[in-house]
Structures are given as structure tokens and as C-alpha cells.
Amino acid sequence: MLDPLPPPPPWLVNWVKPYSEALYLPSLPYHIHEVLGAFVLYQTTQSIISPMLSNILFPHIYPKLNRRTRINWDVHVVSLLQSLLINSAALWVMFKDKERKDMNSSAVERIYGYTGASGLIQALATGYFVWDLVVSARYLKIFGPGILAHAVTALAVFALGFRPFCNYYGPVFILYELSTPFLNIHWFCDKLNMTGGKLQWYNGMLLLSVFFGCRLIWGTYQSLRVYQDVWHTMHLNIQSGPVLREIRESPHSSIFIPRDGQLCLGDASCISAQSEVMKFTGSQTLAIPFWLALVYLTCNLVLNTLNWYWFGKMIETVRKRFEGKPHDEFPRERQRKQSMVELAASELDYDTLSGPKTPYNEKEDEIARAPARSKDNEFARGTDFAKSSAVQDGDHEVKKR
């Protein structure tokens, strides 16, 4: 699928081309306007939009935050905006890009192939991670080395996509961000004095579930697919089908897979989309160099390691919010259940210590329960006494024992 956004102005393409050629990122000039636009959007949101809206929407909270927390607040606003934007775009491309779907049958195209729509996703992600790198480096004491490492490795992974390299996997790994909205909501609940409430509890469960599913299960599986495709392509010497390949007795031979658009039936847009799949690949294209595979796979490994580490920290954080604290909205229910357990335990202890009850003991118990039954009758008639909590009833029975 072609890039749905307009192309960059020619002067910008010509200005970027020398740098992109030096870095061997040939598709970057055609998406540089999207990279810059994303960076400007996120920086403007952090510096202007978030402070302005936060002062209006939360006049009694945001202005009273200290400088450190206010910076963190604005960064979380940007993160929330970016995750909603990039997730929607990535899912749309994965479902609508037919040329990308055709790459499912070819490891070579998944590594070397390119579509404008996937390039858009990589551009938006690159713009965000450039901003993320700047913020993480500037406020290193606030966010720590882990966030900085994430920014560096993520930027490297998505920037390498402009070779193009693993352009197919751009939307795939962006789905890591599906858990980010829940993470930001959890953080905002703490700052809005909603810690321990129902919203934070349910959001926390969704956060752990989505994070585990998207980053740990989906992410690890897709990383293994990347490793497999890279290994296959690096060691590809002979492949059947319409493949032209210069064999130089080395895994660094050039590789080229043409698409002729025969299935487009004269559709001009289809032909254009098909022709750009190998737009930046030709007979002069070298196979994957070892350093590129090493950098990409190492960055991917770092990201996956961070994901597993953060998952453990999130479980610890959620437990601290709720462990040992009765839920604010259910204190009476919790006390009622506790009193029932205590009553049952006391009866069990009595039977264990005193042995089975004699008929005389049972008669005494029957007499002792008579007042409780009368209270139950009053409860059925709707008296005020019947509205007393089950905790008091339970305590009354325990004391009689």
C-alpha cells in the first residue's frame, strides 16, 4: 500500500538525500517530513498543549505539582497520545496493506521488502523515539538509565528500517504500545488521588494482561520470527522462483526479487504499490551484513529483556497498591466475610478441644440461639435492628461461645 500521506517537498528530499546515502537509509528522504512532523507534534504537546490543558482540566492538582512530577505528567500525556495514534495506524496498515500481506510467504521480502504504509509507521515511531531520546537524556535523573536504553535501542531498530530493513516488522513491533495507554492511566490515577479505587484496580488488571499478551507473548514470538528470517536470508544461496541473485561465493551476495504486477489487472494504484515493494532493492543490493544483523538482533534482545523486567516491576507496583488494604468500596462486605470465617473457626476450635457435643450441650446451644432467631425475625419484618451489620451478629455469636 502506498503512503497515504502526501510526499515531502522536493527541496526537503534533496536536502536529506546526502545524509541518508551516507548512512545507507535510502527510504528516509521519502518519510523525513513524517519523522519531523511526529517530533514537532510530541514536543509541542509536552511543552505547550499538556501544561495548558492540564491547568484547565485539573486546576486544583496540576499547578500544585512539583517540577519533577509536572515533567513526568507532561511526558505521560505525550506517551498516551502517541500510543493511541501509533496503535491505530499500525492496526490499520496490518489489515489494509495487501502488499504487506503478500510478504507472509517470503522471508526475503519480509527482510528487504518495503511499502509506503509501513514506512509511515516507521517514520511516526522514529519521530517519537527521537523525542523520547532527547527527553530521556535531558531528564536522566528522573527517568533513569532503563528508559534511556529503551529509547536508544528502539530508535536504532526503527531507524534501520529505512535501509529498508525489516520494514514488514515495523507495525508488528509497534503493537508493543498496546499496553501503554493502561500504564499511563494507572500513573494518572495515583496523581488524581484515585489510588486503590475501582478504576485503578480494573485498569491494573488490564495493564498486566495486555502487557503480558502483547509484549511478552506476541513480542517474543515475533522476535523469534525475525531471528529466523535474518538467519534464512543471510545464508540464502539458492531459492526457487522468480529470484535473481549474484552469487559471489559469500553470504554477502546481492539479492533481488522483482514483482511485475501481473495480478493487478491494469489497476494503476495496485501496479504502483507492487512496484515499490522492491523499490530500494536491486541487483547491486548486498545481503545482510553481519554487523547489521548483530545490531538489530541485540537491540531486539535488549527490548525484550526490558519488557520482562518491567512486567515484574508492574506486578510489584500493583500489589503494593492493593495488598493488605480493604477495597474502599467494599469494607462492610469484607468485614462480614471475616466475621463468618471467625465464627466458623471458633466453632471448629470448640469441637476440637471439647470433643463432640452431648445432648445437654446441644440444648444449651439451642437456648443461646433463641435471641439470634428473634433478631432474624425482626430483620424479616424490616426493623432497624435487622439493618445492623453482619459483623456485629458474628461477634455476638463468638462471644456466646
For the regions a protein language model found, what residue spans apply to each?
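Alpha-helical transmembrane segments and their membrane-interface exit regions
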Residues: 175-186
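Membrane-helix and juxtamembrane interface regions of eukaryotic multi-pass membrane proteins
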Residues: 1-168, 193, 199-214, 218-224, ...
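Blade-edge beta-strand/turn elements of extracellular beta-propeller
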Residues: 188, 194-195
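Hydrophobic alpha-helical membrane segments of integral membrane proteins
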Residues: 168-175
